[in-house]
Amino acid sequence: CTHIKEIEKELKKNKQQLAFEPIDFGYFLNGENDFGSAGGQVACNISGPRRFKAGSVRDHVLGFRGVNGRGEIIKSGGVVVKNVTGYDLSKLICGSYGTLVALTEITFKVLPAPEENKTLIIHNKKLEIAVDLLNKSISSSNDVSGAAILPDDPKVPGSRLNIQKTFQLNDLKHEGSITAIRIEGS
């Protein structure tokens, strides 16, 4: 399957986006950007911080082609959203980890990209404050499209390591949790 990076590059040219926001674990694992493949995202049903607003990968897969374990070509769905009776195989394969079919083609629903987006990064001394801030921002009238907390908690394995490795902003030293809130709109 095609790398997500390539798909997003083409979509950006047309001011479109994959609304489920493919997550990139490269930053957490080795500090490098490598989104992986579209098939991997679908097989694992992995979505990024926009999931609570736009839905998961399975909500954006319109159809697919692939090969099952018997070597048979399987085709499901199409290029438009429609309600059908019976099993929706396009939704069933999401999160199946490739056990049902090896994907060769995927049709995604895409949405217009926002004209503007800003991400606020707030350092908090206590995790409780970070959680409260996140809850208040999501329930506010602002168009929050993504939110995350990176805890600085000794009880959470590797939390200090990830913050120090990934989020050194302009060489600023900080202690505590990080709350990230993204607001989109026009």
Show which residues each predicted segment covers:
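FAD-binding glycine-rich core of flavoenzymes that anchor FAD
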Residues: 1-91
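C-terminal substrate-binding/cap subdomain adjacent to the FAD-binding core in PCMH-type
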Residues: 62-186
